[in-house]
């Protein structure tokens, strides 16, 4: 009988110690489990329809035009072209697509493959923020629909002098063009 009592006490002590160790141990990621219980924010690709259309910057030494299809098949397809001195000096194929519960902006500068993914992290009726903290530059791409009907695209890096934010002010391309 004494042996059974000692065995029960030992087993109970072991369970208590294991429980305390799991609470106190930094290798156990309790915060992750709690975090994973939070509902994931879900975005709908249709909520990005305001990006669709034909956009251009004001004429100057260089001009950029950007074109986005309407939302269809879980994606928007885009392209951007920069013209300076009468020549195309840069172009980029773009895609915004739903992948499961997430939405990604995929950039293919100069048709480079594979593209670079930027995950949608914030979406309102007038602004979309796409991020890829592991990318060199940009780390963040922001599209904003302005009250006057224009579109602002902003690229941001880590905030250093080398990676200053850049804003691109687009207006709708007139039908006469």
Regions found by a protein language model. Give the residues of each.
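Mature N-terminal segment immediately following signal peptide/propeptide cleavage
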Residues: 47-58
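Bacterial N-terminal signal peptides that target proteins for export
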Residues: 2-16
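Edge beta-strand at a domain terminus
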Residues: 37, 115, 119-120, 125, ...
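Well-ordered alpha/beta subsegment
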Residues: 130-132, 136-145, 153-156
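Central antiparallel beta-sheet cores of small beta-barrel/beta-sandwich binding domains
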Residues: 42, 57-134
